[in-house]
């Protein structure tokens, strides 16, 4: 298993990425009795359906994080997807892939980090998302207010690579956030 993430909305729920054979996500509820496994509830998912009805079945899940809006961010061998706070994970395998507008006048967009291996995800105090990839460094994403029918949009604040920063490699294995300064 990978890193265990305690759900901030309900600390009895633990999110556990499975990294080996039959990769997926396990959601474990210990019902307040962590030493008694007999009353635990376990939910396992290895496939999700995105907002366009496409099947998402990553070969590997490398990272998981929860932002301050309670959205779950999942980094995989094929990119990333989110599980919005409104999704009941116990009964649904719904997810969303983030679409970044091309801003070229076509009205089209591309999936954020589509087919890019995402090794690390961290959320800072300002609810910015730091995403570490296997080949293209670190992306810093932030929320902006939107005039669309959604409350916010996501934009790239910065993209750090070996060419424009002091990163020793574009293969990012982990990201740590200094809590007091972000």
Where are these regions (language model features)?
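Short, conserved, GDST-rich strand-edge loop motifs in beta-rich repeat architectures
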Residues: 2, 11-25, 79, 87-90
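Short coil-to-beta transitions that initiate beta-strands within beta-rich domains
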Residues: 1-11, 47-68, 101-126, 159-180
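Loop/turn residues immediately N-terminal
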Residues: 20-26, 77-81, 134-139, 181-182
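Generic recognition of stable, solvent-exposed alpha-helical segments in well-folded globular domains
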Residues: 18-20, 75, 113-116, 133
């Amino acid at each position: 298993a990978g890193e265990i993430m305690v759900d901030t909305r309900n600390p009895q729920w633990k999110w556990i990425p499975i990294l080996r054979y039959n990769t997926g996500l396990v959601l474990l509820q210990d019902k307040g009795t962590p030493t008694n496994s007999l009353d635990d509830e376990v939910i396992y998912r290895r496939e999700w359906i995105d907002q366009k009805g496409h099947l998402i079945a990553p070969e590997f899940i490398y990272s998981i994080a929860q932002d301050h809006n309670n959205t779950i961010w999942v980094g995989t061998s094929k990119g990333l997807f989110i599980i919005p706070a409104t999704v009941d994970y116990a009964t649904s395998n719904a997810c969303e892939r983030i679409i970044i507008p091309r801003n070229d006048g076509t009205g089209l967009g591309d999936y954020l980090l589509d087919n890019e291996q995402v090794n690390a995800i961290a959320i800072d105090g300002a609810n910015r998302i730091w995403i570490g990839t296997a080949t293209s460094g670190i992306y810093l994403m932030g929320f902006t207010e939107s005039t669309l029918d959604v409350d916010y949009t996501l934009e790239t604040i910065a993209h750090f690579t070996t060419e424009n920063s002091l990163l020793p490699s574009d293969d990012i294995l982990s990201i740590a956030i200094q809590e007091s300064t972000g």
